[in-house]
Amino acid sequence: MKNNFSKYQGLGNDFIIFDARSNNLDHLFSKNKDNFIEHLCNRNFGIGADGIILILESNNKCFVRMKIYNSDGSEPEMCGNGIRCLIAFLNDNNEINELSEIPIETKAGLILTYIDGNENIKVNMGEPILSPLDIPTKLLMNSLKVPNGVITLKDQILNVYAASMGNPHMIVFVNDIEGIPFQEWGSFLEKHNTFPNDTNVHFVEIIDKSNIKVKVWERGCGPTLACGTGACACLVVTSKLGKTLNNANVYLPGGKLEVEWPNQSGPVFMQGPALKVFSGEIDI
């Protein structure tokens, strides 16, 4: 059976989007997800993407429900770039019109989104989670109320931090982000037993109080050009540690996200672009 799809990207973090509100795609993906999703996301033998987004009817009075799969078939709780791509898809298909606030249901809960006049998409990412039990992580809370500890990797002792934006993130500060053995460190840390559910890994280089560089190793995907929830988690940790202000530009391999945490007892806001790459149809 042929199904329409659209491919969107947010800073190079790309997704295949299927509108599954009036078909049985959700059932098909749930039943056959592992090999099926890996094939669709394969850049040589499939469409090629970091993940797949299904648009579903919401059961909680939201505009729609977003279901997302990583390229390995796993289902993350939330994806910041993915939700921006979803909003761009809905906007391109004239579903949003004059709505000023678009509530989206996700596995991590209700997420509020907005489109500004330049079609930049702003997302209320909710309050960060810093409780080790809720992230979850075995790291212990330090005096600045951030989970923190050390991990030994061969001859390296890495000082690591943790935060969650509905999904777990490890933050590692480095002096030269291009000089680290990224593949080795990323793959090792993703599966480290300090994080019972595995984790996204972010290597952070501080430029100044308003700008940071981040390199992403995404749980279930490996290297990606950007991670929206990760950018937010990095800003939360850097601001808690006093390394940045409560708003900063986060420079990822795919481009820049603007992240703000105006009140440390409130939500984090992320803003950035999302664009259509192409659309088509595929036999499923």
Swiss-Prot record:
One cellular component term (GO) for this entry is: cytosol
Q: Where is the active site?
A: 79, 227
Identify the main location.
Answer: cytoplasm
Q: Which reaction does it catalyse?
A: (2S,6S)-2,6-diaminopimelate = meso-2,6-diaminopimelate
Q: Where in the cell is it found?
A: Cytoplasm
A single Gene Ontology MF term assigned here is: diaminopimelate epimerase activity
Site label Could be important to modulate the pK values of the two catalytic cysteine residues, positions: 169, 218
Q: Per UniProt, which keywords does this protein have?
A: Amino-acid biosynthesis, Cytoplasm, Isomerase, Lysine biosynthesis
**So what EC number does this one have?**
5.1.1.7
Query: In what pathway does it function?
Result: Amino-acid biosynthesis; L-lysine biosynthesis via DAP pathway; DL-2,6-diaminopimelate from LL-2,6-diaminopimelate: step 1/1
Q: Name one GO biological process term.
A: lysine biosynthetic process via diaminopimelate
Q: Which InterPro entries match?
A: DAP_epimerase_AS, DAP_epimerase_DapF
Q: Which PANTHER family match?
A: DIAMINOPIMELATE EPIMERASE (PTHR31689:SF0), DIAMINOPIMELATE EPIMERASE, CHLOROPLASTIC (PTHR31689)
NCBIfam families xref list:
DapF
Name the job this protein performs: Catalyzes the stereoinversion of LL-2,6-diaminopimelate (L,L-DAP) to meso-diaminopimelate (meso-DAP), a precursor of L-lysine and an essential component of the bacterial peptidoglycan.
Would you identify the family this protein belongs to, as annotated?
A: Belongs to the diaminopimelate epimerase family.
> How is this protein named in the record?
Diaminopimelate epimerase
Which organism does this sequence originate in?
Answer: Prochlorococcus marinus (strain NATL2A)
